[in-house]
């Protein structure tokens, strides 16, 4: 019996060591991809143009402007410009409600699919792709049924599928319309426990160049980090970032990362800061709000952020 227990113990230990080695190697590969990106930034785009008007209407978030609107952990922003309308992320539906929270809010706010030209999925996490079921299936959805998106441009961070449509995975930066740019595939090491499934992940960021304002970044979670996103935007667009809207994944508390982000945006003298409550807690958001004053805008479902 003792011999059996010893053998079993060694086998279990061997399995644990082997798994640790595999996980370590995969994390190392993921970090190497991030390091390569930092060493070889993407090429600059020429003549990106500008939009005259930009309004960002949150359709799903962890805060709401009215009891008539649903809220939850996740993101869904309607980016409205004179060059086109883009839905950034498709929210989260953990209770499998039909209609989903984001679909309910679209009805309440008078938004239809006909209003949307492009679907822009920032990264492949359940709270940005409509729920765990769709995430597991390598796709995304607005609700419990995948609605017809034929004829719409669909931009995804990695190769995803969608019935009746052909999503385009992020690659090099590209101009989507005059003044609207997808900054391309920005790698990051995924967060635990999702990192156990796929350590290396991609997030894409939307950049909108607004006349007389400058470049506004629209972020889903900000996993690559604010500094990397700002540096990428300025390398690609050749002009300074003037604002940031969306997730920055600072978590709870006023951390060193929060202070570094504030300092970076102060250096840029930004015109707009709006942090998502789904991945930055009240203390961090309050620190940004206190620093930037009138330039800071809370994010809540149904509360439009009018840039120009």
At which residue positions do the language-model features occur?
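Zn-dependent metallo-beta-lactamase
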Residues: 4-83, 173-199
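Conserved beta-strand hairpin/beta-sheet module of binuclear metal-dependent hydrolase folds
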Residues: 58-109, 199, 203-218
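Active-site metal-binding loops of divalent metal-dependent hydrolases
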Residues: 61-62, 90-93, 124, 159, ...
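A short helix->loop->beta-strand "cap" motif at the edges of active sites that frequently abuts
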Residues: 84, 142-155, 268-273, 294
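Membrane metalloprotein/metal-transporter helix-bundle signature
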Residues: 95, 127, 154-162, 247-252, ...
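Active-site metal-binding motif and surrounding structural segment of the metallo-beta-lactamase
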Residues: 98-153, 237-245
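Cap/insert and terminal regions of metallo-dependent hydrolase folds
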Residues: 118, 125, 205, 212-217, ...
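Metallo-beta-lactamase
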Residues: 144-204, 297-308
């Amino acid at each position: 019996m003792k011999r059996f227990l010893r053998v079993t113990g060694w086998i279990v230990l061997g399995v644990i060591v082997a798994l640790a080695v595999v996980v370590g190697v995969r994390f190392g590969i993921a970090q190497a991809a991030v390091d390569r990106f930092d060493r070889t930034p993407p090429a600059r785009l020429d003549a990106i143009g500008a939009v005259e008007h930009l309004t960002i209407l949150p359709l799903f978030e962890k805060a709401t402007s009215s009891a008539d609107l649903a809220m939850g952990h996740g993101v869904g922003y309607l980016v409205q410009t004179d060059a086109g309308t883009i839905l950034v992320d498709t929210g989260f539906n953990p209770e499998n409600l039909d209609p989903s929270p984001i679909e309910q809010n679209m009805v309440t706010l008078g938004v239809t699919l006909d209003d949307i030209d492009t679907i822009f999925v920032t990264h492949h996490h359940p709270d940005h792709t409509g729920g765990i079921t769709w995430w597991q299936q390598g796709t995304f959805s607005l609700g419990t049924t995948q609605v017809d998106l034929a004829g719409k441009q669909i931009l995804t961070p990695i190769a995803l599928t969608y019935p009746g449509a052909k999503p385009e995975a992020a690659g090099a930066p590209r101009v989507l319309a005059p003044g609207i740019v997808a900054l391309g595939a920005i790698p990051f090491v995924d967060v635990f426990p999702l990192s156990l499934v796929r350590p290396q992940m991609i997030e894409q960021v939307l950049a909108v160049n607004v006349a007389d304002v400058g470049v506004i970044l629209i972020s889903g979670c900000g996993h690559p980090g604010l500094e990397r996103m700002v540096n990428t935007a300025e390398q690609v667009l050749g002009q300074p970032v003037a604002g940031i809207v969306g997730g920055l994944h600072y978590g709870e508390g006023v951390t060193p990362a929060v202070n570094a982000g504030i300092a970076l945006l102060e250096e840029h003298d930004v015109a707009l800061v709006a942090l998502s409550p789904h991945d930055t807690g009240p203390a961090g958001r309050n620190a940004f709000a206190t620093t930037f004053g009138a330039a800071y805008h809370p994010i809540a479902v149904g509360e439009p952020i009018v840039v120009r």
